[in-house]
Amino acid sequence: MTIAPPVDQATLDVAVALLREAGDRTLRWFRRDDLEVHRKADGTPVPAADRDAERFLREQLAERFPGDGVLGEEESPTPSTTGRRWILDPIDGTKAFTCGVPLYSNLLALEDEHGIAVGVINLPALGEAVWAGRGLGCWSERGPARVSDHAEVAGAFIMSSSFMRWPGDTALQLDRSGAVLRTWGDGYGYALVATGRAAAMVDPVVEPYDVGPMPVILAEAGGRFTDLAGAESIEGGSGLATNGPLHDELLALLRP
C-alpha cells in the first residue's frame, strides 16, 4: 500500500490563518440585532455573514493557490487545474449562529490526489480551533490534540446534530447502555471528539462541505472517520467520527 506523503507545513499554516480571519469576519455579525438573514427553499437560514466569509475565503485561496478548485456551500464550485480542491463551509451551524448560540464553526479542508490533506475547524465565538495536516499531527491551542481512550459504550459521550434521524430505537438502546447522549453537533461535535472530550459524533445527513476537514483531523488525532456505511469518504451523505475503539460497535447499530 502506498503511503501518502505529508502535506506542506506552510499550506497548513495558511489554511489556519485564513480560517481564523474568516471566523473573525463572522463574529462581527454574531448576536447583532440587525443581522441580515435570507432563507433557502428548504428554510435553511443563510446569514449575510455566511456569504461574506465564503467570498473572502474564495478570494484569498485564489490568490495564494491559483488553479486549485473550491467547493463551498453558498457559491458554485470552482474547477481545479492542479488536481487539488479546497472544501469550505464558512458557517457550519447557521441555525446556531442566527440564534446567537456560540457553537457554530468555520470549516476548511484541502483535498489532493491522496485524499483530505488539511483540515481546520474554527470555533470563533469560543476562541477555539482544531487543525491537522496529513503527517503533521492534530493540534489545538492547548497543544497536540488526541482522542480519548474510552473503550465502552457505558459512560461514553456521544454527540449528534440530531437523534431524530437515527435508525429505529438506536438512541434509546445507547441510552439504556449508559451512553451520555448530547446534541452538541456540527463542527463543534467533531472538535470534541478530536480533543478527547467526547467519544463519538454521529451525523445522519451531511454534505461534503459539512465534513471536509474531518478525515484528516480524526486520523491525525488517533481516531476514525467514516460514513454510516463504513466507507472512508466525505461523499457518503453521513458521518461518524469516533475515538477508534467504539467505531465498529456504533457502525453496527447505525448502519443504514
Predicted segment positions?
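An extended, acidic
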Residues: 147-256
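Residue-level signal for inorganic ion chemistry
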Residues: 22, 26-29, 50, 61, ...
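A structural micro-motif at secondary-structure boundaries
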Residues: 140-144
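N-terminal subdomain of lithium-sensitive/metallo-dependent phosphomonoesterases centered on the IMPase/IPPase/PAP
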Residues: 1-91, 246, 251-252
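Generic detector of well-ordered alpha-helical packing
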Residues: 51, 74, 90-93, 124, ...
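A structural micro-motif
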Residues: 35, 68, 136, 178-179, ...
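DPxDG-like acidic metal-binding loop motif
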Residues: 80-136
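Solvent-exposed alpha-helices and their adjacent loops that cap or buttress functional pockets
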Residues: 38, 78-80, 113, 131, ...
